Amino acid sequence: MSRLAVDSGQVLAEPKSNAEIVFKGRNVEIPDHFRIYVSQKLARLERFDRTIYLFDVELDHERNRRQRKSCQRVEITARGRGPVVRGEACADSFYAALESAVVKLESRLRRGKDRRKVHYGDKTPVSLAEATAVVPAPENGFNTRPAEAHDHDGAVVEREPGRIVRTKEHPAKPMSVDDALYQMELVGHDFFLFYDKDTERPSVVYRRHAYDYGLIRLA
């Protein structure tokens, strides 16, 4: 299990997030100073949605086979009364990945706030300058090692490619195709599985080339 190096002289004065933050590290130990830094970064995002009660922050050291180098991935999921909003990024360090993930999450939260304003009759979008200030990131980085798989006896086994490594379950709240496209954009995915309230069937919207979308329905 790897650890994060810390500069004892680093001082962070930003306020902490009011929402609960749940951290999950895959093959990396997340120290307290990094948790505090993340909390301070996320505190700036709560103004876009005051109903946010939980941030899920996941750090993962993965192997980028195309570039043949190690990749540090950070995924941040914001949960509130509205749709789930997510930002994720991959970089050569966890700090760099965090910065990119926060930028993506901020953009999607701002988009959701603008949509709510228009829906409730307030046509004035949030100012871009309001959210441009960023907190300088420490120069310290993670020292990581490739992920290892274990069998039931605890022995290390080599993980082969082409396997299902993650399974997720989501509530199937009926929604329109437009709402499904909106939620797909908020989580930053190329597809979105949903229950179509018009056809009462499971359906999938997906991103095509040239900013177009596709729709798959079960017969």
From Swiss-Prot:
Belongs to the HPF/YfiA ribosome-associated protein family. Long HPF subfamily. Interacts with 100S ribosomes. Its main location: cytoplasm. It is found in: Cytoplasm. The keyword Cytoplasm applies. NCBIfam families: yfiA. This is Ribosome hibernation promotion factor. One of its GO terms (cellular component) is cytosolic small ribosomal subunit. Keywords: Cytoplasm, Translation regulation. The keyword Cytoplasm applies. SUPFAM superfamilies: Ribosome binding protein Y (YfiA homologue). Required for dimerization of active 70S ribosomes into 100S ribosomes in stationary phase; 100S ribosomes are translationally inactive and sometimes present during exponential growth. GO terms for biological process: negative regulation of translational elongation. GO terms for molecular function: ribosomal small subunit binding.
